[in-house]
């Protein structure tokens, strides 16, 4: 079974520097998507993404790994471990007019039924994440906390 790569792209009407800062700093991630994320932004540094009581399911989880590549305002690549072995997530940025194209790819899923299910979940999650990033940077809208029953 060959598990496909995840690939999403979005255009965000925001300067590339602002998109970069939002994707490569703890403050950036925590302002729109996570709660308690930590980033040591350098090649060989680390990223630890944390969600607390997130979304309609009130999920609390974390994942992270090693930062592989940092080219300011162009490329941010890290490994994390949502599957049975690490996968590689790459954000590639490109200036388009007054906005920014963001291309996200995730590669390296092991070939198993369990990892296929994880890949499907991450594909949906990354699509949601880029939509939330766009809404935040263009309109200041965040998902917010969902009340408990």
Residue spans for each PLM region:
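Hydrophobic pocket/interface hotspot
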Residues: 19-20, 29, 47-49, 67, ...
């Amino acid at each position: 079974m060959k598990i496909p790569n995840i690939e999403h792209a979005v255009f965000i009407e925001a300067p590339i520097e602002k998109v970069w800062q939002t994707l490569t700093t703890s403050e950036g991630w925590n302002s729109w998507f996570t709660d308690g994320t930590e980033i040591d932004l350098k090649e060989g540094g680390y990223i630890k993404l944390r969600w607390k009581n997130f979304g309609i399911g009130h999920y609390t989880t974390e994942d992270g790994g090693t930062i592989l590549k940092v080219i300011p305002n162009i490329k941010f690549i890290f490994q994390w471990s949502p599957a049975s072995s690490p996968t590689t997530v790459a954000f590639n940025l490109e200036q388009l007019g007054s906005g920014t194209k963001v291309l996200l790819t995730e590669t390296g899923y092991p070939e198993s039924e369990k990892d296929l299910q994880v890949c499907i979940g991450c594909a949906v999650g990354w699509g949601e994440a880029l939509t939330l990033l766009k809404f935040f940077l263009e309109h200041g809208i965040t998902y917010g906390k969902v009340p408990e029953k």
